[in-house]
Every structure is written in C-alpha cells, then in structure tokens.
C-alpha cells in the first residue's frame, strides 16, 4: 500500500510540475492563443483544462498502480528468498531475477550479523538476570543464616540459662521438706522445665546445626547422637555402618538427620529415637525412628516446614523420602540415596 501511494504521488508531482512549468512559459514568453483557449474550449461539456487534469490523474493512477504492483512483487520475492536462505534452502536464479538475487544476498549478509548480535545480547541479558538472581539468592541465604545464628546465641545465653537455673532451684526446693499441696506441685514444675529444656535444645539444633567439617557422615551422626545423649532425657541410640559416602550427598543427609531428630525431640513425646545408616550395595539407607505419639502424615505434611525441608534435600541428591507415622505407634523416616560405585572405585 505504501509503494502504491508513493508511486501515484510521484507521478502526479512530476506531471503537474511539467504542466505548471509549461503554462508559466506560455504566460510569460509565448502567450499562444491555443493555451488561452484551453480555459474556454470544452470536451464532453467539460473545460479542456479540467478534462486534461482528470485525464492526467487517471493516467497517474494507472501507471502508479502498475509500478507499485511490480515493486511489491519484487519485495515479496526478496523476502521469500531471504527466508529460504535462512532455512538453508536453494535460491532460484535466472536472467530476470539475477539483480534481485544480488540485492537479496546483500540484505541477507546484513541481517545475519544483526540477528547473531541480537541473539548474543539476548543471551547476555538472560545470563545477567540469572547471575543477579544467584547473587541475590546467596545474599538472602547468608542473611537468613546470620539471623539463625543470632537467634540461637540469644536463646542459649538467655532462655536456656534461665531454664537451667530454674531446674537447679526446683531441685534445691525438692530437697527441703514442703507441706502439701506444695510438695505435689514440684514434680509438675520439674516436668515443665524439662520439657522446656528439651524444646530449647531441639530449637538450637534446628537453628544452629552442626556441620560435618572433615568428618564422614557416619562419624558426624555418631558425634551428634553422643552429644544429645548427654543433654536430653530421651534415649538416643544409633546403628551406623562404616562405608564411604559420596561427598556431594553427605551434608544433605546429615542435615536431614538433624532435622528429623529435632522434630522428634519437639513433637514426638516419645522416650526413644533410633538413627540407622546402612549400605545396601546400590544405595544407602538412612532411617530415623521414634516410639512417640505419631501423627497423620497427610494433614501434618502440608503444615510442617521441617518435613518439607527434609524432602527437598532428599530430592536434590536424587534420593527418595518416605515417612510412615501412625497415632500412638511412632514415626519412621527413611531416605534412600543411590551410590555411584564407579565414582567411588575411581576415587580409590
């Protein structure tokens, strides 16, 4: 449409420019009677001057339409050849389109670098976005970790110490002879303080988890269990097989163990928790089991951040995560992680 309008406009401008110049020459220099008569002579009842104008406009429309059609054909051919070239198809050449083909190739060679540069800039923008996201993610994790450490220190230095002091005071009061009903309230208070201390230790374990550092997974779990045996009234036992665990999954499995024990201490109301780690040739089995009150897994899972976090850690290392719990029958968590024997043997 644009080519059509431009062609007609160009023809009209050209013809009318010639006509005005011709009339100007006649008026100033020649003043021929023939041109004066153009304003008075009629054709089909129309003055000759007006008739000629209509004829010129009609001719310009016809000629401009033909030119615009040919230009559009050429442009369509050029676009089709560019598309064929981009798709790797053969471009047809003959005597009529050799010039257009040359123009097409020139345009193609101009567009290819521009397209490559556009793709490069698009990928660079995407990479910058990903890098910015990763940087922000690292910063957020660092802020969260620092805040967890701060909360753990405050809990340990204030609430934990106060609970310990309350426990010592209750023990001293218990040694003295109290009249009923005060002597009957002391055991209740002791139980409340012990439960609070247990909750506090579970929170500290959750907020400030112990890292493996240079220890193996088995050694880390053993040390964790031994440390808890000294601090919590619940019986904590372990059965750990000594075998090499890939370094890439050790930390995740250790964090899962900590999270599971923390949840057990806080919510199970049980008297015993067992941690087991076995080598099953193609995979390892990590099991944490307690004899507590249990719960409805479907209802609890959607509300528990700890359970979701354990499952996410398991999925990150390609492991399966299963949890079985029944009311008054305890809870069992099992994680099965594949062992890459080829990597382990090559590492030896």
Curated annotation (Swiss-Prot):
Domain Histidine kinase: 150-341
GO molecular function: ATP binding; phosphorelay sensor kinase activity; protein dimerization activity
Organism: Staphylococcus epidermidis (strain ATCC 35984 / DSM 28319 / BCRC 17069 / CCUG 31568 / BM 3577 / RP62A)
Lineage of producing organism: Bacteria, Bacillati, Bacillota, Bacilli, Bacillales
Gene3D superfamilies (alphabetical): 1.20.5.1930, Histidine kinase-like ATPase, C-terminal domain
Superkingdom of the organism of origin: Bacteria
Phosphoprotein recorded as keyword: yes
EC category: transferase
Enzyme Commission no: 2.7.13.3
One annotated Gene Ontology cellular component of this protein: plasma membrane
Function: Member of the two-component regulatory system VraS/VraR involved in the control of the cell wall peptidoglycan biosynthesis. Probably activates VraR by phosphorylation.
Subcellular location: Cell membrane
UniProt-listed PANTHER family: NITRATE/NITRITE SENSOR PROTEIN NARX-RELATED (PTHR24421), SENSOR HISTIDINE KINASE NARS (PTHR24421:SF37)
InterPro entries assigned to the protein according to its UniProt record, in alphabetical order: HATPase_C_sf, LiaS/VraS, Sensor_HK_TwoCompSys, Sig_transdc_His_kin_sub3_dim/P
SS bond partners: none
Protein name: Sensor protein VraS
Catalytic activity: ATP + protein L-histidine = ADP + protein N-phospho-L-histidine
Main location: membrane
Its membrane topology: Multi-pass membrane protein
